[in-house]
Regions:
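Short helix-capping segments at alpha-helix termini
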Residues: 38-42, 80-82, 141-144, 168
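Active-site neighborhood of HAD-like aspartate-dependent phosphohydrolases
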Residues: 1-48
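An amphipathic alpha-helix signature
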Residues: 25-33, 68, 72, 130
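Substrate-recognition element of Asp-dependent hydrolases with the DxDx(T/V) motif
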Residues: 86-104, 109-140, 149-152
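A metal-dependent, Asp-based hydrolase signature
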Residues: 47, 52-97
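Asp-based, Mg2+/Mn2+-dependent phosphohydrolase catalytic module
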Residues: 1-7, 110, 114, 129-130, ...
Length: 231
């Protein structure tokens, strides 16, 4: 599929597309499982944490704050309604480490953005906690390549239609690049846009979804390969 010159804007996902994210949450999850090892099996801790995350996302949205609340809720239930002091401080340490980890840019991202800059208007289209996502965007060193950063409440068809309207685009004029089939690929092609999938080896369970069949989806093995379609 030749996309050269067919789009004015390119929208990029952020977490696990531009920089590493999920691997840090997996590391936090492993520490949490160890912390609660005396209360149930590793599978029991993991299942409880996942269920509490799913319960809290509709209330608090996406991001490490929701993850922190989910950990506290899971620990409280697993501990029988009373949170021991060492569990409380253990959770606090896990969340602190998660919140202040070094931001690691994914290999090939900077070179790809440098090549595209000047040919397209590049926009980050991510979801999550606004201050958290904007903070990562600012310290990433990538802001110089982007027109601006959109932090969306969610990433479904409705949100992408709103994004298109905001930029005076028809839905079929959206070109989205991202790692998540559920958030970056399926909703975009469902409204008529084009999506380029840059798979990541670590996928959040909440984002797992089979790839839809569509001739408007391109799958690349690393982000540098998008240049073959765009320049």
């Amino acid at each position: 599929m030749d996309l050269k010159g067919k789009f004015r804007y390119i929208f990029f996902d952020a977490d696990d597309t531009l920089w590493e994210n999920e691997r840090y949450f997996r590391a936090a999850e492993a520490k949490f499982i160890d912390l609660l090892a005396d209360y149930t099996t590793p599978e029991g801790v993991q299942d409880m944490l996942w269920r509490k995350q799913e319960d809290n996302i509709p209330l608090f949205g996406y991001g490490s704050k929701t993850y922190m609340i989910g950990m506290a809720d899971a620990a409280l239930e697993l501990c029988g309604g009373t949170l021991p002091e060492h569990i409380y401080y253990g959770i606090k340490k896990i969340i602190t480490d998660l919140a202040f980890h070094e931001l690691e840019i994914i290999e090939g991202v900077k070179e790809t953005l440098q090549a595209l800059q000047g040919h397209y208007e590049l926009i980050v289209a991510t979801k999550g906690d606004l201050p958290e996502q904007m903070g990562k965007f600012r310290i990433s060193g990538l802001a110089q390549y982007f027109h601006h950063c959109e932090v969306m409440e969610n990433k479904d068809e409705k949100n992408y239609l709103e994004l298109a309207a905001k930029h005076n685009l028809a839905p079929e004029q959206i070109l989205m690049i991202g790692n998540s089939v559920k958030s970056d690929i399926a909703p975009v092609v469902n409204i008529g846009g084009i999506a380029i999938n840059t798979p990541h080896e670590v996928v959040w369970v909440h984002e797992m979804m089979d790839m839809p069949e569509s001739d408007r989806i391109i799958i690349v093995q690393n982000i540098r390969e998008v240049l073959d379609y765009l320049l």
